Design a protein with these regions (language model features):
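Unusually extended, aromatic-enriched hydrophobic runs near protein termini
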Residues: 85-122, 142
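Alpha-helical repeat scaffolds
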Residues: 33-46, 72-87, 111-123
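Short coil/turn connectors between adjacent alpha-helices in alpha-solenoid helical repeat scaffolds
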Residues: 18-33, 62-77, 103-115
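Amphipathic alpha-helical repeat scaffolds of TPR domains
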Residues: 1-23, 48-67, 91-105, 132-136
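Terminal, low-structured helical/coil segments at or just beyond the last alpha-helical repeat
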Residues: 117-143
Length: 143
């Protein structure tokens, strides 16, 4: 699902980067926001073939709503979608990211515990660079 990854990358710019430096033109900023919103709308109608594809789509939707105009009904259905697929995901990095974004929407302590466990495992596997941003995001949610 290339579209899911594209939305994740666009949303990441707003979540993790200095987007105030990137978008000095309001027209460009609006264009990116519109692209994210259109991508979210498209992804809510698609279903992944594999658990990983479904997780990528759910993650992109939740990331998109973290930086764009929110739609609580779509967020709720995406959370259901994510919770259904989370136990089936083998990719720990993907599972960790999706778990953190789910936690950021519902603040379920079990999700936070799972995210911390996954972050710890990934660090022990030498994949710290892949979780540094999501770990900081988790900490900001727990604040």
């Amino acid at each position: 699902m290339n579209q899911a990854r594209e939305i994740q990358q666009l949303a990441s710019r707003f979540l993790y980067d200095e987007c105030d430096r990137m978008y000095t033109d309001i027209g460009e900023w609006t264009e990116v926001q519109d692209c994210i919103t259109q991508g979210i709308d498209s992804l809510t109608k698609l279903e992944g073939i594999t658990p990983e594809e479904e997780a990528e789509a759910a993650l992109a939707i939740l990331m998109g709503y973290a930086v764009a105009v929110r739609n609580n009904r779509n967020i709720a259905s995406t959370l259901k979608r994510a919770r259904k697929v989370l136990p089936k995901i083998e990719d720990k990095v993907l599972k960790c990211h999706l778990t953190v974004f789910c936690y950021g929407e519902c603040f379920d302590s079990k999700l936070a515990e799972e995210a911390h466990r996954l972050i710890g495992e990934l660090k022990n596997e030498g994949k710290e660079s892949e979780v540094v941003t999501v770990e900081a995001l988790l900490e900001s949610y727990e604040f």
